[in-house]
Curated annotation (Swiss-Prot):
It is an enzyme of class 3 (hydrolase). The lineage of its organism: Archaea, Methanobacteriati, Methanobacteriota, Methanomada group, Methanobacteria. It is found in: Cell membrane. GO terms for cellular component: plasma membrane. PANTHER family: UNDECAPRENYL-DIPHOSPHATASE. It is a multi-pass membrane protein. Its EC number is 3.6.1.27. Catalyzes the dephosphorylation of undecaprenyl diphosphate (UPP). It catalyses: di-trans,octa-cis-undecaprenyl diphosphate + H2O = di-trans,octa-cis-undecaprenyl phosphate + phosphate + H(+). This is Undecaprenyl-diphosphatase. Keywords: Cell membrane, Hydrolase, Membrane, Transmembrane, Transmembrane helix. GO terms for molecular function: undecaprenyl-diphosphatase activity. It comes from Methanobrevibacter smithii (strain ATCC 35061 / DSM 861 / OCM 144 / PS). The chain crosses the membrane at residues 1-21, 38-58, 93-113, 118-138, 168-188, 191-211, 222-242, 256-276. Pfam families: BacA.
Amino acid sequence: MDIIQAIIIGIVQGLTEFLPVSSSAHLIFAQNALGVESSLAFDVFLHLGSLIAVLWFFRADIIRMIQAFLLSIGDIIQHRFKEGFYSDPYKRLVWYVIIATIPVGLVGVLFESQVESLFAGALYVPAFFLFVTGTILYLSQRMNSGEVDLSNLSLKESIFMGLGQACAILPGLSRSGTTIAAGLVIGLDKEFAAKFSFILSIPAILGAFVVQLKDIGTITDFNALAILFGFLAALISGYLAIKWLLELIQKRSLDIFAYYCWIVGIIVFMGSITHLF
């Protein structure tokens, strides 16, 4: 993989990790179109770039969540967890994120081999699920923005969004798309649904990063320059994608992404079954 290809793949990763169009599908499509196969080291640093992007964008919230978690541990030691939990929205948020991450962790562990086989399969698989992503987005935009935000978020809404994230382990189902849609279905405010979706992505991306990192010692192919440019491209484009989507969801619907998913999904699906791709 040369530097230009690395930058393209990095941009695709950064944009599609956070825009509701499925990073897994687009990485498969992009690598297929460019005729390249990314190395383990490259994948590790792409995930690191995406992780840093979301951590930096929500740094104020992350700092408050870390503080709230430590205070919550103190509450447990002092036998006043319930009192602290209901008095501080960030204490609730950090525990809700932890609990909502459990479904995707279980799916990843229990169905790892089955999911990997889908990623290694024909292009029509991610193309089909990309079309499904478009349908989920379109239907979710027909619902009015709810009133649930940080102040009144409950365990029920958190688990429902966590289940949406678990479904998105399938190639072509957008993680941000399914979680935002799940949030809207269960009554979250549109802007908060997107924000919670992004914060919920942090442990998921971190988990993928750690899983790949454990095999880093087996790497023999290491193109440092390509990895650096891919990492920077994923970081910068990921940050911009988060910023743009949060601005967009305040003013307009996400129908444009639904139409995009339908068009790309149909083109790639037809191209795959007719062996054009």
